Amino acid sequence: MSGSRKFFVGGNWKMNGSRDDNDKLLKLLSEAHFDDNTEVLIAPPSVFLHEIRKSLKKEIHVAAQNCYKVSKGAFTGEISPAMIRDIGCDWVILGHSERRNIFGESDELIAEKVQHALAEGLSVIACIGETLSERESNKTEEVCVRQLKAIANKIKSADEWKRVVVAYEPVWAIGTGKVATPQQAQEVHNFLRKWFKTNAPNGVDEKIRIIYGGSVTAANCKELAQQHDVDGFLVGGASLKPEFTEICKARQR
């Protein structure tokens, strides 16, 4: 990771948690010390967002796991960026592979969500990544560019890019126990950074944080974190365990 980009670790709880379990995790996070060069975020299910934001120290961000592309209306089951901000949260995860593959969200819909979330003042973790069959067909770069291009078409200014973190999450490594090698992760992250150099406003390529998601654990995080273009992690299952605090410290000495 470049020293000019602040290390970023997000914990995506997915559809997990209870008030009792949450209290235990929040206690661990509240007692943990993260240095000034590390930014930490957790994304609980939406029903817990308000309660957790009120009880967790402000240094740790709280994110929603999803939102819709308009501010209000007859969209049963959806929440809007305005609602997320209204309860004190300032981040949202969009484009996660589970939203794409289980719920059928298209590149265009995800891009529209990103555009609206940014317009409403949220910061965004924008997820991209390929499936195993796409990797085996040597389509990793093609898929990532297709997904990223849809998002980039909706973001016009360098100022908006400052509120975006890109999460590269190879779908074949999510919840499978498989993990991209540090070299594989660096290769894709470096490719993405070069793509930004020619497809985004001047300077975005050096400043944007590109984080890795896919079976990150305390055992493999340090080696991954040493890669020049890996600026942090989006953590799934391990974010529900005490080891999450160790992952957050992957670059602390």
UniProtKB/Swiss-Prot annotation:
GO terms for molecular function: triose-phosphate isomerase activity. Its EC number is 5.3.1.1. One of its GO terms (cellular component) is cytosol. GO terms for biological process: gluconeogenesis; glyceraldehyde-3-phosphate biosynthetic process; glycerol catabolic process; glycolytic process. It is found in: Cytoplasm. It is an enzyme of class 5 (isomerase). It catalyses: D-glyceraldehyde 3-phosphate = dihydroxyacetone phosphate. Gene3D superfamilies: Aldolase class I (3.20.20.70). SUPFAM superfamilies: Triosephosphate isomerase (TIM) (SSF51351). Keywords: Cytoplasm, Gluconeogenesis, Glycolysis, Isomerase. Substrate binds at residues 12, 14. Pathway: Carbohydrate biosynthesis; gluconeogenesis; Carbohydrate degradation; glycolysis; D-glyceraldehyde 3-phosphate from glycerone phosphate: step 1/1. The active site is at 96 (electrophile), 169 (proton acceptor). Pfam families: TIM (PF00121). Antigen to the host M.1 monoclonal antibody. Belongs to the triosephosphate isomerase family. Homodimer. PANTHER family: TRIOSEPHOSPHATE ISOMERASE (PTHR21139:SF2). HAMAP family: TIM_B. This is Triosephosphate isomerase. It comes from Schistosoma mansoni. The lineage of its organism: Eukaryota, Metazoa, Spiralia, Lophotrochozoa, Platyhelminthes. The gene is TPI.
